[in-house]
Amino acid sequence: MSTNEGSLWGGRFAGGPSDALAALSKSTHFDWVLAPYDLTASRAHTMVLFRAGLLTEEQRDGLLAGLDSLAQDVADGSFGPLVTDEDVHSALERGLIDRVGPDLGGRLRAGRSRNDQVAALFRMWLRDAVRRVATGVLDVVGALAEQAAAHPSAIMPGKTHLQSAQPILLAHHLLAHAHPLLRDLDRIVDFDKRAAVSPYGSGALAGSSLGLDPDAIAADLGFSAAADNSVDATAARDFAAEAAFVFAMIAVDLSRLAEDIIVWSSTEFGYVTLHDSWSTGSSIMPQKKNPDIAELARGKSGRLIGNLAGLLATLKAQPLAYNRDLQEDKEPVFDSVAQLELLLPAMAGLVASLTFNVQRMAELAPAGYTLATDLAEWLVRQGVPFRSAHEAAGAAVRAAEQRGVGLQELTDDELAAISPELTPQVREVLTIEGSVSARDCRGGTAPGRVAEQLNAIGEAAERLRRQLVR
């Protein structure tokens, strides 16, 4: 049987919790990462108590000195949680009381509950964590942009349903992976608007009667505002769910990029060669070079999706306000951040180190009659209704299949027999270069448009980098 010695809540209990309850309740094995934020918030809370007339100058200075000493010991590892500590809050209060005594150390708890405290600390930690993740995402975007810039004219088969569809620029395809990641960064910027609301001053759920100033502590801790509703402030974890969604979405976007790399590096495709430093071998097959980073990215995406789903399931049926279920809110989010901090540098390095086999991609670009749409659209430009043009292009594909040749290898007579509008001038678009150049619309794969897109992505990345600084 445990005791209530050092507990934050034991006064009305005749004895301590059972060993099983103490083990179940313990959270220092994951919430200790909040310790620096807890100490920062305690400094700010000390000042709020002083301004409210609840501490003398001597008491204020004593608490601040004790907190500074404790912070140093936490930072260098000389102070940490004991097996008897329930959570980060009780561990740090024990450390503070050891330094300043129970009378002074016990004054810091006035006007705050673990309910508003942990909600604030979680927001503080998460606002920093999303910025670390964002830096890693920007590195992947940068690697994609650099590869796109290095291959401005390389042409590859564009695919739908994993079937050859139309020729596109390799740079266009690479930037198609950068755009979703930039949207993820926009989500992080937008998320911070809602995360930057301080629950401090809400107490357990009803606020405080001690004349404290929630706006002052919000400003001291870098929040943009104090919460408008104390019940909501202590109970809400939509900010955590929103972050978990953004993390899962980043993982999904990385997984789609990883899938392309896995397929492209296969013998059958042969689009890319993996660098030795960013691939692994086989314990039995000497010839293997495996895309493990990409495969782990694909696998970890499921883990982050699971973290999001688990958190939402935890939140879905809780009555207001705080419930102990919310102890389960942090581990999935902490894990998602940890996995992305492992994965993002590896993906950035993998992308940057890829060697593209541009000749093979160019050779495969017209395979599968990928120029058929160009033929149909050329006829449309000659005034042929698209339905008729589509049928003529299909007939041309059938004729080429029967001969076992590409569309560009059909003779002038064969083309004319299919449609009198198919004059020799159609050959201008029956090349992969002509095909990509013809798609000169906004967002298209023409070289000039892709160059514009590359510049825009660079500008967007710089804008986001500035927005994420605080």
From Swiss-Prot:
Its EC number is 4.3.2.1. The keyword Amino-acid biosynthesis applies. It comes from the Bacteria. Keywords: Amino-acid biosynthesis, Arginine biosynthesis, Cytoplasm, Lyase. Gene3D superfamilies: Fumarase/aspartase (C-terminal domain), Fumarase/aspartase (Central domain), Fumarase/aspartase (N-terminal domain). Transmembrane segments: none annotated. It catalyses: 2-(N(omega)-L-arginino)succinate = fumarate + L-arginine. One of its GO terms (biological process) is arginine biosynthetic process via ornithine. SUPFAM superfamilies: L-aspartase-like. It holds the Pfam family ASL_C2. GO terms for cellular component: cytosol. Pathway: Amino-acid biosynthesis; L-arginine biosynthesis; L-arginine from L-ornithine and carbamoyl phosphate: step 3/3. InterPro entries: Arg_succ_lyase_C, Argininosuccinate_lyase, Fumarase/histidase_N, Fumarate_lyase_CS, Fumarate_lyase_fam, Fumarate_lyase_N, L-Aspartase-like. It is an enzyme of class 4 (lyase). GO terms for molecular function: argininosuccinate lyase activity. It is found in: Cytoplasm. Belongs to the lyase 1 family. Argininosuccinate lyase subfamily. This is Argininosuccinate lyase.
